Swiss-Prot record:
Keyword Disulfide bond appears in the UniProt entry: no
Biological process annotations from GO: tricarboxylic acid cycle
A GO term for molecular function: L-malate dehydrogenase (NAD+) activity
Annotated InterPro entries: NAD(P)-bd_dom_sf
Lineage, uppermost ranks: Bacteria, Bacillati, Bacillota, Clostridia, Eubacteriales
EC class name: oxidoreductase
UniProt protein name: Malate dehydrogenase
Gene coding for it: mdh
Length: 30
């Protein structure tokens, strides 16, 4: 079972965090 990662907020910080998490395969972005 993969972890679910929720990015709170929008803008560069949220986008960067989501991209980093997705590229590192940390879990599903929800």
């Amino acid at each position: 079972m993969t972890k679910k990662i929720t990015i709170i907020g929008a803008g560069n910080v949220g986008a960067t965090a989501a991209x980093x998490a997705a590229s590192k395969d940390l879990g599903d972005i929800v």
